């Protein structure tokens, strides 16, 4: 018999936290090193940089659409742990192929195709891992400790992002791009071993024989807070990709104008994004207290407003090497911490235990759609309008969700907004 939530041991929770960090190190390092690899190894020119980088991201996200939906359901059927282990191993295969793409593919077009394939493989692997880690955190929690456990998981994910940009993105300047890319394979293998050794499944198995789209749709249709959570996923998940991809692109391709080396530019961008990760990480405990005191919806509202303000302010930055850029980045960071935690807690609150994987799978599918839309449009805006344009675009999206969250807060204040969420205070 599988252990219940009360029987989950401390070392199993700690393993979940560590794996959350390792998974984000892998995913973030892959995205962060991509512009540097395409520019300096595959020699992709500035004129097409935005489109090429965005297309790579979109291809992987299209794959994730199918992975999230099916594997979320499959995890409800067979458990999360074996999917996590397999995902790490698949990701390791893609991570080995990626730096070898110039030699495997030969000519520049062939090398780019091989790199696309390697990114698809890595995305398939990581797409099998991190949603199941989030679901497992939900499995381990109950109403009394959910905000704490999911916040701790989010804290470790933010720590992984911070580690990449503050430390690991300094490696290309010393050991080279290839060594840095191969590091991702080692991280994946370590993750597979840790998951197999220490994680445990605790959720009840579903009796559904196919992906329960109808059941998920009925849940979302009936619960306004789930609608807000899903809408937040559409916009908020793309925000972190925006910062990781387009800010790095901006620094690397602006470097020639200010006579700064490419590796140095990548390191400067990495330190800035590392600062963002540090702010996200350090503010998550504050958001946890805010959520427990004021509620999930209020956290989404405030987080989206802060992010929107920061993104729009980035539109007024001309030179990314200017110190002014730090202020909007700090606003985005603080906002994203709230947007990262609160919608997931809302989703876990309202998902049946035997369908949690499926509901989170649908939640993540919506996030993929947001990334595909915003990154694709962002790449076009980067190339044809300018580097700040993608940030303004996504800032407007954040404002739209802020307006929806505010409307829901007001409707609940009038007593017509849906049932109470565990841990939420009543809005007087």
Curated annotation (Swiss-Prot):
One annotated GO biological process: iron ion transport
Induction: The first gene in the probable 17 gene mamAB operon.
Gene null: resulting phenotype: Slight decrease in magnetic response, has about 30% fewer magnetosomes which are about 40% smaller than wild-type. Double mamH-mamZ deletion cells have a poor magnetic response and very few wild-type crystals; most cells have flake-like crystals. Deletion of approximately 80 kb of DNA, including this operon, leads to cells that are non-magnetic, lack internal membrane systems, grow poorly, have reduced mobility and take-up and accumulate iron poorly.
Pfam family, one: MFS_1
Transmembrane segments: 18-38, 54-74, 83-103, 104-124, 149-169, 175-195, 240-260, 271-291, 299-321, 326-348, 355-375, 377-397
Keyword set, alphabetical order: Biomineralization, Ion transport, Iron, Iron transport, Magnetosome, Membrane, Transmembrane, Transmembrane helix, Transport
Cellular compartments per GO CC: magnetosome membrane
Membrane topology per record: Multi-pass membrane protein
One of the record's GO molecular function terms: transmembrane transporter activity
Alphabetized InterPro entries for the sequence: MFS, MFS_dom, MFS_trans_sf, Tet-R_TetA/multi-R_MdtG-like
Localization, UniProt: Magnetosome membrane
Source organism superkingdom: Bacteria
PROSITE patterns: MFS
Family the entry assigns: Belongs to the major facilitator superfamily.
Miscellaneous notes: This bacteria makes up to 60 cubo-octahedral magnetosomes of about 45 nm in diameter which contain membrane-bound crystals of magnetite (Fe(3)O(4)). Expression of just the minimal mamAB gene cluster (MGMSRv2__2365 to MGMSRv2__2381), including this gene, is sufficient to form a minimal magnetosome chain with small magnetite particles.
Protein function: Required for correct biomineralization of the magnetosome; probably transports some form of iron. Partially functionally redundant with MamZ.
Protein name: Magnetosome protein MamH
Protein's organism: Magnetospirillum gryphiswaldense (strain DSM 6361 / JCM 21280 / NBRC 15271 / MSR-1)
